[in-house]
């Protein structure tokens, strides 16, 4: 998975198992790589709309265009991670993403706007989620769901910095704000790559070094590492991928449009300042339930719990549609965090439990392809519906319906038999 020489289970400066440091580095990676383009995306979109006066579909459609690169590169970046290692992918991706943010700060028209966002998304796709998860999957087979929850939690924690980004936009302008974020991104790449880029020991050696044996009944003590071709032939791969893609339809829409829904007069109708506090609450709620979900996922059947959490994600969308005032928005934020936050690490951990470590990067990349396609489509479709109707209600109810379908689909994801 990674390129450095193997290290022992304990770091030289700490008695903490090194895999936890890899998970923490992955969390920091996600804070940087997802903060400006995922958690804070709608605040930047509002600033762009205010300055240029473009339609809602044009402004938010950039999220779809940016994810197009991620969709195309999903399988490739997984293969590259397995071949070259997490460290090299993080340095390359953060350099590209940071340069894209600097370019973004200088844009003057829609062509530059879309090109800059594509570069940003491309960089963070290469150096962000897939390599971080591949490293954690290699290091932490004994506590896979918990470790993955820490990494994914970093994405949620990126939302904690939304008020700071809003403050920067209001006081220094969106151009200076994105320029500084770009510099921070480039600087963050090498240290994160150094920590996460150390190669995990062989599976048998790793299991001798961990403090405790497996306590997850779904995870065998010795796993078969499925190849990508073998994984594609299983019902579990497609059930997990389809379910994950359906649930992420609403994730793409919410990340692009939440600030608009919270501040629009025909939406929740909050002030910009009040709305900026809801997004960190969403982030903290998601982060908390991601950790709880990871902890539970290492001890109970993930396949039994995930459908309930997916349904709660759908319920939160209905609550957002009905929300009037701050309390309604707050209720949405908490329930969204419970559903979205809790189910996310479990879905990813199921892949590791079912398909092993060796080819996890490319298997995750192939799964990310339909997820990225869904997240690519919904921002622009929801924006177009809003431009035509002046409301997000029909879109939110439709996305809730997709969550119901996903809750049924994941039940089909039984553990595949070991290929002969």
Task: Describe the function of each predicted region.
Residues 31, 100, 112-127, 328-341:
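Hydrophobic core of transmembrane alpha-helices in multi-pass small-molecule transporters
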Residues 48, 126-140, 342-355:
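Intracellular juxtamembrane helix-capping segments at the cytosolic ends
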Residues 48-49, 80-81, 163-172, 262-263, ...:
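Interfacial helix-cap and linker-helix signal at transmembrane-aqueous boundaries
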Residues 155-201:
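Helix-loop-helix hairpin linking two adjacent transmembrane segments in secondary transporters
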Residues 274-276, 280-350:
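C-terminal transmembrane helical hairpin of 12-TM major facilitator-type secondary transporters
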Residues 95-108, 312-324:
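C-terminal ends and interior cores of transmembrane alpha-helices
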Residues 37-45, 229-288, 295, 378:
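Extracytoplasmic gate region of multi-pass secondary transporters
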Residues 21-56, 73, 77, 162, ...:
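Extracytoplasmic
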């Amino acid at each position: 998975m990674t390129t450095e020489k193997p290290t022992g289970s304990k770091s030289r400066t700490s008695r903490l198992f090194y895999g936890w440091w890899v998970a923490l580095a992955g969390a920091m990676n996600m804070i940087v790589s997802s903060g400006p383009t995922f958690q804070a995306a709608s605040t930047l979109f509002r600033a762009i709309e205010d300055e240029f006066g473009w339609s809602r579909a044009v402004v938010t459609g950039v999220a779809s265009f940016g994810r197009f690169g991620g969709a195309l590169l999903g399988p490739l970046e997984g293969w590259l991670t397995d071949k070259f290692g997490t460290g090299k992918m993080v340095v390359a991706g953060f350099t590209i993403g940071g340069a894209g943010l600097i370019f973004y700060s200088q844009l003057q028209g829609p062509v530059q706007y879309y090109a800059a966002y594509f570069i940003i998304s491309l960089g963070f796709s290469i150096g962000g989620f897939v390599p971080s998860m591949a490293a954690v999957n290699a290091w932490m087979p004994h506590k896979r769901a918990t470790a993955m929850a820490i990494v994914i939690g970093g994405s949620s924690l990126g939302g904690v910095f939304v008020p700071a980004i809003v403050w920067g936009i209001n006081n220094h302008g969106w151009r200076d704000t994105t320029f500084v974020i770009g510099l921070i991104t480039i600087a963050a790449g090498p240290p994160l790559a150094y920590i996460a880029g150390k190669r995990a020991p062989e599976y048998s050696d790793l299991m001798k070094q961990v403090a405790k044996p497996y306590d997850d009944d779904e995870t065998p003590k010795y796993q078969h590492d499925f190849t990508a071709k073998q994984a594609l032939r299983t019902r579990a791969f497609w059930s997990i991928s389809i379910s994950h893609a359906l649930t992420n339809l609403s994730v793409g829409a919410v990340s692009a449009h939440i600030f608009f829904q919270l501040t629009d007069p025909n939406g929740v109708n909050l002030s910009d300042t009040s709305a900026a506090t809801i997004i960190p609450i969403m982030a903290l709620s998601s982060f908390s339930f991601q950790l709880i979900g990871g902890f539970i996922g290492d001890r109970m059947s993930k396949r039994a719990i995930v459908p309930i959490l997916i349904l709660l994600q759908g319920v939160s969308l209905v609550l957002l549609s009905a929300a009037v005032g701050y309390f309604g928005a707050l209720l949405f934020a908490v329930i969204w965090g419970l559903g979205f936050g809790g189910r996310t690490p479990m879905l990813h951990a199921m892949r590791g439990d079912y398909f092993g470590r060796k080819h996890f990067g490319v298997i995750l990349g192939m799964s990310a392809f339909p997820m990225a396609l869904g997240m690519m489509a919904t921002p622009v479709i929801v924006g177009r519906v809003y431009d035509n109707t002046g409301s997000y209600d029909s879109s939110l109810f439709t996305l809730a319906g997709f969550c119901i379908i996903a809750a049924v689909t994941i039940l089909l994801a039984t553990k595949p038999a070991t290929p002969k």
